[in-house]
Amino acid sequence: MKASPHRAAPCGAQPPGSSMNAIPPFAHLCEPAASLEDGHGRTVRYIRLSVTDRCNLRCTYCRSGMETFIPHESVLRYEEMEQLVDMAMDMGVEKVRLTGGEPFARKGFADFLERLRAAHPALDIRVTTNGTLIGPHIQTLKAIGLNAVNLSLDTFDRDKFEQITGRDLFGKVRENMDALLDAGIPFKLNAVAMRGFNDDELPAFIDYAMHHPIDVRFIEFMPMGEGTRWSDSCFWSAPDILDAVKGLVAVAPVEQEQRNGGPARLYTLSGP
């Protein structure tokens, strides 16, 4: 096995889904500030937009079967999101990640991406998805030059996939992963690491990263709100994940200047 530039990030944090309430046209609210800053005075170059709270999966650590959703009339329209992105770019934002729920579960999402790219050719546009519904849109994503996809996949085992998501769609996800690779669209696998569930699959994730031009991010299992099924017996800490990876393959930390500014610690993998 040749040395690989592909990376694992054992300590990314999994942000809870969120949605934004509808508001009046942004142009009437205020004059945009010169730049965006967070509470620590750092300049914000990257924003996340949740386009929907709906999802076609029922992951045990996420919704746990809950069926209460934000009313359609309270969710931002695509036109409002376009205005929001316009304003954010005026304040120095360079990257937008579109999330859900499952963004492709919302009607017209691919058309929205096309309009966003047409309006902002230089904007770094990324999508986070569960990989089940993206297939019919991959050629469109390639045509508009989508910068990258984050694809959530916790297991390479079909039965485990159905156990955790409530849906027998593992084959569809693998098919769409292959289609993304064929289209040349960069993607990263997000895997929630859980003791007693997928810790035995660490070699499979490493092997996939070593043989494909993708990154893998291992995410700590954490409570995601009321009604989710969380147990501390399943918790697998970032240091322990990293130690397990080191037991399988050589790793080297990515230099600070190569990082994307996020909280994850990045490592390159290499092996025989």
Indicate where each model-derived feature is located.
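Short glycine-enriched, charge-decorated loop/helix-capping segments at active-site entrances
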Residues: 67-75, 162-168, 230-233
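Conserved alpha-helical substructure of the radical SAM core
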Residues: 21-124
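Radical SAM enzyme [4Fe-4S]-AdoMet core and its adjacent flexible, acidic
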Residues: 30, 159, 168-174, 178-272
